[in-house]
Amino acid sequence: VTFFALPFPKSLDNGFSSNEMIPIIDSYSYSIADKLATCCEHIAMQLNTSLQFVQDKSEAIFTTGGGAFNRYLQQRIEAQTNRKVVVPSAEIVNYKEALIIAFMGVLRWRNEINVLQTVTGAKADSVNGAIYY
């Protein structure tokens, strides 16, 4: 999959999983448990590869999102990265996306940059979103 060879910064959306990864996984006749274990191992390996480019060599990884509730995935990440996985409260895991979007909305309302090229890989920082009165 070419995405993994692309330079940083880069980000994924749900379409990547649906269009790129699921067809590969579905092409094999292994059990669902084996496929899920393989996906968890792949995620942990890719995270470890990405961490090689991070200057901060802290001993912990702070996780959020749906994967934060997957204890097996967390164990595989710890094994691959040799770092402790820290999972915040369920409230933070469940609502961090809403908080981020709300914060981006406030920045947009103030006409301040709310999308950074260093995070998204865009050509420039920008102000995104629409305000309707």
What is each stretch, according to the model?
Residues S89-Y133:
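Glycine-rich phosphate-binding/hydrolytic loop that grips phosphoryl groups
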Residues S58-I77:
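Glycine-rich phosphate-binding loops at beta-strand->alpha-helix junctions
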Residues Q80-T81:
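Short, structured coil segments at secondary-structure junctions
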Residues T49-E59:
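Phosphate/pyrophosphate-binding loops at sites that engage ATP/ADP/AMP, CoA/4′-phosphopantetheine
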Residues I43, I77, A98:
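Hydrophobic, well-ordered secondary-structure elements that form the walls
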